[in-house]
Amino acid sequence: MEPGRFRNRVKILTFTTSRDPSGQPVESWTGGNPVPAEVKGISGREQLSGGAETAQATIRVWMRFRSELNASSRLEVLSGPYKGQVLNIIGPPVANATGTRLEILCKTGAEK
């Protein structure tokens, strides 16, 4: 591992459904502790959709292997240039050859 590579912090968000006092289901995204990661932008695009301009960015996140992370999770960026953004994972996390790190491709911006 290169020192200083994982200088950003992200929180892994998982979708949960619970019940409120009246018994109705309440859906929410809950997160655990912050984990170190490397967050880098890959590409971005703008398009017109329904008369409104929308923008999307593709972001690559590297982190140490985490078994609780899957394609249905989200990542909340807590530090760095993307601080405060919630990233939608667009594919399954891919482990490196030694199984110690994960590469995660994410999108931010308007979702269809």
Curated annotation (Swiss-Prot):
Keyword Membrane: no
Swiss-Prot/TrEMBL keywords: Viral genome ejection through host cell envelope, Viral long flexible tail ejection system, Viral penetration into host cytoplasm, Virion, Virus entry into host cell
InterPro entries the UniProt entry points to: Phage_SPP1_head-tail_adaptor (IPR008767), SSP1_head-tail_sf (IPR038666)
Primary localisation category: virion
Pfam families per record: Phage_H_T_join
Keyword Metal-binding in annotation: no
Similarity annotation: Belongs to the Caudoviricetes gp7/gp16 head completion protein family.
Summary of subunit composition and partner proteins: Interacts with the connector protein gp15. Interacts with the head-tail joining protein gp17.
NCBIfam families: gp16_SPP1 (TIGR01563)
Name of this chain's protein: Head completion protein gp7
Lineage: Viruses, Duplodnaviria, Heunggongvirae, Uroviricota, Caudoviricetes
Designated gene of the protein: 7
